């Protein structure tokens, strides 16, 4: 079942009208994420809530993005002031997912407080547009980055260039000038 949220005409994103990016967190990570940092991710989101962050943006890709969205929804069950913003790069993205991941995606999108669909269909560069949207609307980025090239590296470099705080939950630290957040710190 394709995403059926319509966005017509060149109007400002709802996000731009209501959100405070200074109190927002974005997630970025590899699609190959297998859940190994589930405890660290949950602890990080709880810690960020304790620091006053209430809005969490997920790029809604398979892997770390969906896992992060699910953690935020769990936190929201205990703290109704938490908001999940599902940032979907293009309409129909979920059609490229496995059946199990499609179900997870649709469940998270349906439960999100806000959904931003950035393009009517796939086009070259749409993932970079999504990544820019995430970084530009967050004060802090939580990552699962192992040092490999790709969209996660691009997103973290953009975040660092824009002075965003970055937490990398991957135990290797990923090789960028960011420190990994160790589970023991939580």
Kindly give the residue locations of the regions a language model identified.
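Acidic/glycine-enriched connector segments
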Residues: 12-186
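N-terminal amphipathic/basic-hydrophobic helices that include classical n-h-c signal peptides
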Residues: 1-16
